[in-house]
């Protein structure tokens, strides 16, 4: 009877471990490729997306140059899903441009050091919906902002065109 209980426990542990592995696997694979890219961006330059261009006929511009490291829904720990798309420039913080992906109304709350949002009243893919594009990590580790002076803290509902320079990639979270 003890042997059956131990085998059952091992089976439960194996299945649980396999479930955790499957949950994290896509993120782990992306993390591995991201580390390769960050160690030597020039060696993987063909992995970079170009700022200001579109993917096929998509209405949105690529907001910055770099490697798309993490996607919406990636998991880094159980019960948590990433809520964004992280693009890594592979250069020194403050050097890689960040531009508006689509025209809309920009807001930067008074206490935001590294982030802004752009409200798009009519999603080009679903015109009956309003969406927001969110731009973040635009400051150094000490919180010194890389957002351009045109958008100081407290900016609210300022219209910007697609391609407008918003700031530069940083490494502040």
What is the role of each PLM region?
Residues 1-17:
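N-terminal Sec-pathway targeting helices
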Residues 145-173:
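Beta-rich strand-turn-strand
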Residues 100-153:
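Zn2+-dependent peptidoglycan hydrolase active-site motif and core
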Residues 4, 79-81, 86-87, 140-141, ...:
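Mixed-charge, polar/low-complexity N-terminal
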Residues 5-6, 93, 152:
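Hydrophobic alpha-helical segments and their boundary regions
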Residues 21-115, 121-123, 161-162, 171:
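Surface-exposed, glycine-biased beta-strand/turn segments
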